[in-house]
From Swiss-Prot:
Keywords: Oxidoreductase. It catalyses: 15,16-dihydrobiliverdin + oxidized 2[4Fe-4S]-[ferredoxin] = biliverdin IXalpha + reduced 2[4Fe-4S]-[ferredoxin] + 2 H(+). One of its GO terms (biological process) is phytochromobilin biosynthetic process. It comes from Nostoc punctiforme (strain ATCC 29133 / PCC 73102). It is an enzyme of class 1 (oxidoreductase). GO terms for molecular function: 15,16-dihydrobiliverdin:ferredoxin oxidoreductase activity; cobalt ion binding. Transmembrane segments: none annotated. This is 15,16-dihydrobiliverdin:ferredoxin oxidoreductase. The keyword Oxidoreductase applies. Catalyzes the two-electron reduction of biliverdin IX-alpha at the C15 methine bridge. Its EC number is 1.3.7.2.
Length: 244
């Protein structure tokens, strides 16, 4: 269901940026599960460029049982742009959940006006995809913008409205990146480093997908995937607790 989204993202990335492959830890790039009614495959890709230090995207194909496309784009540490977050999930062809956002690193007014306010036009363009659903695992005020698209919808809407919104959000993000001024002050850069690490930690501690990964691919593999690839700057809770 979400293969056209993956293909569009990939085409955009290769056309716009001088990409280099980024190493995915052994055993995490691809895996097949024989659990459940439909075998599931998970495949991930990871790249970097001068402007973007980590571009990761993952596709889970479990046939009619599940189709999942997830991606996060991390700007280089000398840019204070939000992260681009994409999470599209379908279960049994009837439950379709889409999340698309510029995920802010900071909440101060200047930052919000600079990077989040420009999203308002697109948010208003897709009111049917901005459903103000409850976030069960996250604080909506942390690492999410007030103009995120967050909706439960049907397969036809995914292929039309959601795909159109996806293209619009990507185009605005690329434009913001092109217009961004690189930071050179070491203190500014360290602030970005910390903010992106904090994002990884926050996300790894709360990501509800870890249970899904475990159900398909086993707990040990899921933990590695979460902490060595998806959110590699996060410290596993057991490790952080032992250091106290």
């Amino acid at each position: 269901m979400y293969k056209p989204f993956l293909e569009f993202l990939e085409k955009e990335l290769f056309q716009r940026f001088d990409l280099q492959s980024r190493v995915i830890p052994p055993g995490l790039e691809f895996k097949v599960s024989d659990r459940g009614r439909n075998p599931a495959t998970i495949r991930s890709w990871c790249y970097q460029s001068q402007e973007l230090r980590k571009i990761r995207y993952t596709y889970i194909d479990a046939g009619e049982s599940a189709q999942i496309f997830n991606s996060v784009v991390y700007p280089s540490h000398n840019y204070d742009l939000p992260l681009l977050g994409i999470d599209f999930l379908s279960f049994g062809k009837v439950k379709n959940l889409i999340v698309l956002d510029f995920q802010p690193l900071f909440q101060d007014e200047d930052y919000q006006n600079k990077y989040i306010a420009p999203l308002k036009y697109l948010h208003n363009k897709y009111p049917d995809l901005a459903q103000n659903l409850e976030m069960k695992f996250y604080d909506a005020n942390q690492y999410f913008s007030k103009y995120l698209l967050f909706a439960k919808t049907d397969a036809e809407t995914v292929s039309t409205r959601v795909f159109e919104a996806f293209q619009d959000y990507l185009n605005l993000y690329w434009q913001m990146l092109a217009d961004a001024q690189a930071l050179h002050d070491p203190e500014d850069i360290q602030r970005i480093v910390k903010a992106q690490k904090d994002y990884d930690q926050y996300s790894a501690d709360r990501d509800p997908a870890s249970g899904l990964f475990s159900s398909y691919f086993g707990h040990e593999w899921a933990e590695r995937f979460l902490h060595e690839f998806l959110f590699e700057d996060a410290v596993p809770l057991a490790v952080s607790a032992s250091k106290r």
